[in-house]
Amino acid sequence: VALAALDTNAVTDQLISLQSQNIPVVGFDSGVPDAPPGSIVANASTNNFAAAGLAAEKMFEALESQIRSATAANPVRIVVFNQDARGESLLSRGRGFRDTLVDTIIARTPHTAADIRVMGNPAFVASHNPTTGNKVIIEMAVPASSSAQDTTAMAQAVLNRVRGDNIKGIFMSNEGTVVGLLAATDDGAALPATYPGLIAIGFDAGRAQKAAVRNQYFLGSITQDPFQIGFQAVNLANKARLGQSVADVDTGAKFYTHLNMDDDDIKGLIYD
């Protein structure tokens, strides 16, 4: 069985039953978090930490010169939009972007950890993160609720601070936060006009998000690989059926821009 569980609690009895019958279950897409021990033999899903890390690398490349020259008097602030602080996928994406950006700044600029500050929602600020620097600030934002209204309100509040707080980049870790930013910016059209130079990077591939990428309102976005998710899930299930050893598979992610979104290896991944 290949299973994408929106609510693990809703399938607990079925998982226990399948396990008692020695029927292997493979989790795919979001996997099956908190499943009964041993009931899921492997998962085929996106490594969300790594996928968001790719976004951090692209953000750094776009802002490298400004990050290098950042000072306490003229800092660079990058804001990460996370729709909530509970879901494992969003937690992994926020943390992956955060840690990759911190590590990249330290590795590729004169700045040290003492120059960097990670701040914001406590779920996204870890004990190993630098929290006292004043040259590069990574702000982890979460709306009051995951509703579209509150997500848009969060986006608008951050946009109101772009100039005053030297906000240079925004990463949106899912389609919901992308929609919030687009709602606050006339589907992105206000970004180049009102916030010139602000780098926006999204995640996933809804119709409005793809239009924002195509129109170059966004630098680009991260897409998962639904083909590989399905293919690897079936492959793992078949191996498990045959009694072969199986392990979790990272199905990968890609960064798409206005330049490559019509390429054969990308366009099939970003359907509406």
Model-derived segments and spans:
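A residue-level marker of the well-folded mature domains of exported/periplasmic proteins
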Residues: 1-272
